[in-house]
Amino acid sequence: MFEVKHMDGIDVFFFMWAASLIFFMKAGFIALEIGQFRAKNVSYHCVLKLLDLAAVFIAYLFIGYGISYGFENIMPLITGTFDADLGAWWMKMVMFAAAAVTIITGGVAERIKILPYFIGALIVGGILYPIVEHLVWGGGFANLGINFHDYAGSGAVHLFGGLVGLMAAYVLGPRIDKYINGKPQAIPGHNIPIAVLGAFILAFGWYGFNIGSASGIANGVELASVAMATTMALAGGIIGGALSSRNDPLYTANGMCAGLVAVCSGVDLFTPIGAFIVGLLAGIQQPFTYKFIEEKLKIDDVCAIGPVHAMSGLIGVICAGIPFLLKADAVSKVSITGQIIGAIVIALIAIVGGLIIYKGLDLTIGLRVSEEAEKVGLDTAILQTTAYSEE
């Protein structure tokens, strides 16, 4: 049975600090995503982002945490009779759940209906993600004898969230005019600077995401090592994105995020140079992965969650088991076989679960907005508003 470790008051504050930064990452997700698509759908997308946050908080309280760490903790959480240890742990972990679920909007932007999206967020945040969380951090893999290391969620959060989002986008189908005679067409974003700003907000919050994955505040060497590895992966991601895209601003900004995604798994184990290499690889692969998803799989991945989250998460999980990227005293702690098995299991849960959830919603209440609403713009057609004044 999973037990939350005892925390001193300073550890509780440390977890609240981390949870606050992870919560603020939501602002980064919103800005990064809305900048990458058309202005006529911006306000609608903001509503989706707000609703998935509420959905996860509700679902994770009543069922998700129980699946992850044991249902004996549910009643204390619901009734407010929990101790500081449980409350602090729940606050941090619900933010991880919210991060995993909110990735999905990047793949389904500009065409999904509000109600099925909200229901999907409830199911993913309350059931599907907690299954993965139990395996990774709740003792599931360990009980099965699988040595899987995922310190801050390259696999549990990003590989999972990216693949679920791709499955939702696959079920939805591409946006109108995305493919003409089977060939993908560029649909430019309306505000690249706000997307880049969003990437910076995400990077700021990522320090809480990674450093906050420590068991407490006492081990200063661990915290400093995690912070340094995070910083070097960020740099590698930027350079990789710039090199592979010939300085395209979106790929460069997304490269920063890709590097941060990839470093999460082994951020406590990588050397600074190892972290840089991991970030570099994640940044470089973006345009090639995006092209494969767009041209071969025919999935309209609006905000590149495939390369930024799914593929970068996979790279991070695998790299956490490669000895030459790790500190000398870390090599014995991980197994490349365990990393590969863990990645396969997470991917299967995300792909199969995502297809079942979103295909089920599509067959029952319908996933997609009308063709007319999509052409007019969801802000005007559904919300009767606009994101920007015409004056």
From Swiss-Prot:
One of its GO terms (biological process) is ammonium transmembrane transport. Activity is regulated by the nitrogen regulatory protein GlnK1 via direct interaction. Formation of the GlnK1/Amt1 complex is decreased in the presence of Mg-ATP or 2-oxoglutarate. The presence of both effectors abolishes the formation of the complex. The record marks 158, 309 as: Twin-His motif. Important for optimum substrate conductance. One of its GO terms (molecular function) is ammonium channel activity. One of its GO terms (cellular component) is plasma membrane. It is found in: Cell membrane. Keywords: Ammonia transport, Cell membrane, Membrane, Transmembrane, Transmembrane helix, Transport. InterPro entries: Ammonium/urea_transptr, Ammonium_transpt, Ammonium_transpt_CS, NH4_transpt_AmtB-like_dom. SUPFAM superfamilies: Ammonium transporter. It comes from the Archaea. Gene3D superfamilies: Ammonium transporter AmtB like domains. Homotrimer. Interacts and forms a complex with GlnK1. Belongs to the ammonia transporter channel (TC 1.A.11.2) family. This is Ammonium transporter Amt1. It comes from Methanocaldococcus jannaschii (strain ATCC 43067 / DSM 2661 / JAL-1 / JCM 10045 / NBRC 100440). The lineage of its organism: Archaea, Methanobacteriati, Methanobacteriota, Methanomada group, Methanococci. The gene is amt1.
